[in-house]
């Protein structure tokens, strides 16, 4: 609980946050079970994160109709991005996603225009990796950008 309170305080200083759905629910104390969550709930969660001080929000990992969805939310924009879902658990995917977001911002790219590119890049690289039973990791040594 202390750690979550600390993260909530940090929201006042963040220009952008990239929580997965679980993290976003914890940060906002949203009162629905995971299985009850719909797109409109995620938009409410993003609005609440915005009211807590963050300018731009990317909520990752919302599964719907065998797609993996990301919500981009800012003051004037609510936009959904979809990607095919690969039926495998990969450790570190969210971290790589956030790093690629940061990279796009440093390059001066418009975030809204970069999200689909980032999702496609992750999908293509995860799809090419060897799959093992249990939890897998992103194999960065095999990660290809711009092939």
Show the residue positions of the predicted features.
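Short, small-residue alpha-helix embedded
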Residues: 88-111, 115
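Short, charged, surface-exposed loops that flank catalytic or proteolytic processing sites
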Residues: 32-41, 106-116
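Hydrophobic residues in alpha-helical segments
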Residues: 28, 105-106, 126
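Conserved phosphate/ATP/ADP-binding segment of small-molecule kinases
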Residues: 1-78
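Short pre-catalytic strand/loop immediately N-terminal to key active-site residues, enriched for Gly-Thr
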Residues: 78-92
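Residues on a specific face of well-ordered alpha-helices
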Residues: 5-8, 12, 47, 99, ...
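Charged C-terminal helix
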Residues: 112-147
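Glycine-rich beta-alpha junction loops
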Residues: 23, 61-65, 84-87, 119-122
């Amino acid at each position: 609980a202390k750690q979550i309170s600390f993260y909530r305080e940090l929201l006042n200083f963040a220009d952008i946050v990239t929580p997965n759905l679980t993290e976003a629910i914890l940060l906002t104390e949203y009162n629905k079970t995971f299985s009850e969550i719909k797109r409109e709930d995620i938009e409410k969660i993003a609005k609440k994160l915005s009211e807590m001080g963050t300018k731009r929000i990317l909520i990752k990992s919302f599964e719907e109709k065998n797609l993996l969805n990301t919500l981009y939310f800012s003051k004037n924009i609510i936009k959904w991005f979809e990607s095919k879902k690969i039926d495998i658990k990969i450790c570190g995917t969210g971290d790589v996603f956030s790093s690629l977001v940061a990279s796009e911002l440093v390059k001066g790219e418009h975030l809204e225009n970069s999200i689909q590119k980032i999702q496609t890049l992750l999908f293509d690289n995860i799809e090419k990796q060897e799959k093992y039973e249990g939890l897998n990791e992103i194999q960065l040594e095999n990660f290809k950008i711009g092939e």
